[in-house]
């Protein structure tokens, strides 16, 4: 009995989900409006702050192409960043590497998100948060959404704002600490970054509580 040869690739290749406004509309039906999205950038790097953003989109002026910032090119993120700032209510907060070292990265991230939400000029009735954890101490309702930056346009917008803001901060830090190449890797554990740390030791932006530095 002959067997049909299987195709080399699926007939219907996987397409990542595209964020929409469904969570926001559901909250509105429950009487919770305005709705903010919140996300952070920079949990994983060896250096620099973790940056959080909270965004309340204008439902009549949602920028086209919003998605998880990790799925976008730097050019796409920069363009959407400017569109978000021009059309939405935005607040940004950060926790420094020193703050991360005195607490931990999760607490520092959630605290930055809490401050970003509370910094909004328009008070949100509910905040949609990327991930499994809700920042403690919020003055509004909150809903954690796993992979929320690919499911909610509000969270996607927040992820873009946080990512672009942090990348710009690390590019500026490169001028102060030129030995580490922060403008190229934003503090992530690339080979170039690890080599620079081995050659020059850590600087004040490095997270000394992270594993590579614990033995120093």
From Swiss-Prot:
The keyword Protein transport does not apply. InterPro entries: RNase_HII (IPR022898), RNase_HII/HIII (IPR001352), RNase_HII/HIII_dom (IPR024567), RNaseH-like_sf (IPR012337), RNaseH_sf (IPR036397). A divalent metal cation binds at residues 39-40, 130. PROSITE patterns: RNASE_H_2 (PS51975). Residues 33-216 form the RNase H type-2 domain. It holds the Pfam family RNase_HII. Transmembrane segments: none annotated. GO terms for cellular component: cytoplasm; ribonuclease H2 complex. Its cofactor is Mn(2+); Mg(2+). Manganese or magnesium. Binds 1 divalent metal ion per monomer in the absence of substrate. May bind a second metal ion after substrate binding. Its EC number is 3.1.26.4. It comes from the Bacteria. It is an enzyme of class 3 (hydrolase). One of its GO terms (biological process) is mismatch repair. One of its GO terms (molecular function) is RNA binding. Keywords: Cytoplasm, Endonuclease, Hydrolase, Manganese, Metal-binding, Nuclease. It is found in: Cytoplasm. It catalyses: Endonucleolytic cleavage to 5'-phosphomonoester. NCBIfam families: PRK00015.1-3 (NF000595). Endonuclease that specifically degrades the RNA of RNA-DNA hybrids. HAMAP family: RNase_HII_B. Belongs to the RNase HII family. This is Ribonuclease HII. It comes from Sinorhizobium medicae (strain WSM419) (Ensifer medicae). The gene is rnhB.
């Amino acid at each position: 009995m002959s067997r049909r040869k299987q195709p080399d690739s699926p007939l219907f290749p996987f397409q990542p989900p595209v964020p929409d406004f469904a969570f926001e509309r559901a909250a509105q039906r429950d009487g919770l409006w305005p709705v903010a999205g919140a996300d952070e950038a920079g949990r994983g790097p060896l250096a620099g702050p973790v940056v959080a953003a909270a965004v309340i989109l204008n439902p009549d002026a949602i920028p086209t192409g919003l998605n998880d910032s990790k799925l976008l090119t730097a050019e796409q993120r920069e363009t959407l960043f400017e569109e978000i700032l021009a059309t939405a209510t935005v607040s940004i907060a950060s926790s420094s590497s020193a703050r991360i070292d005195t607490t931990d990265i999760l607490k520092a991230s959630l605290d930055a998100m809490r401050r970003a939400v509370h910094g909004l000029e328009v008070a949100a009735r509910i905040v949609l948060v990327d991930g499994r954890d809700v920042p403690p101490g919020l003055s509004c309702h909150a809903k954690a959404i796993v992979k929320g930056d690919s499911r909610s346009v509000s969270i996607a917008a927040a992820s873009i704002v946080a990512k672009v803001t942090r990348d710009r901060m690390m590019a500026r830090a490169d001028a102060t600490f030129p030995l580490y190449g922060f403008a190229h890797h934003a503090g992530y554990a690339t080979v170039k970054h690890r080599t620079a740390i081995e050659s020059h030791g850590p600087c004040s932006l490095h997270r000394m509580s992270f594993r590579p530095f614990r033995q120093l």
